[in-house]
Amino acid sequence: LHLDHGTYEGCYKCIKAGFTSIMFDGSHYPIDENVAKTKELVAVAHAMGMSIEAEVGSIGGEEDGVVGMGECADPDECKRVADLGVDMLAAGIGNIHGKYPANWQGLSFETLDAIQQKTGVMPLVLHGGTGIPADMIKKAIDLGVSKINVNTECQLSFADATRKYIEAGKDLEGKGFDPRKLLAPGAEAIKATVKEKMELFGSVGKA
């Protein structure tokens, strides 16, 4: 059970609640404070047998009601956080949460390459996977990205399938209003999206 974009306080709550993995998002703190809090949480999480992901460089878009512009992380700051012993590192490389605007400049592979050179074998995480072109995804993987988060695209697939079910009047046929039936098309749509992403990411058969 993983916590995504957790606050300092939220991480402690999830540690106590028995989560198996946490992500501490300290990207909005000055780097020294981010390092200090991350170091503390690494020690606590590892003592509990949990994995921990950290973030450097704020990832733009909207996540849990917070809106921001994508920025590129400083590779040297990434190394400082990676050296703390985190299990995964999320670094801003121009990626954002949610839908990408028409004027999006794309991922900064120069930044990603520099981060990979500084952090070595550290598994890198790409947030905001929705809408990134397949060729960019594959290049990011080649440059060290090991985990890609895709949320908005799954939600859009769910909403579209559920909308079609209701617009077709299926909820008015028999017991089509049963939540298990009403929500089933959306769930299947998410499965299809996940399968598509697994094939693109090269993660099929690696569970």
Regions found by a protein language model. Name each.
Residues E167-D178:
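Active-site gating loops and adjacent loop-to-helix segments of metal-dependent hydrolytic enzymes
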Residues H5-M122, A134-V150, L156, R163-K164, ...:
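Alpha/beta enzyme core
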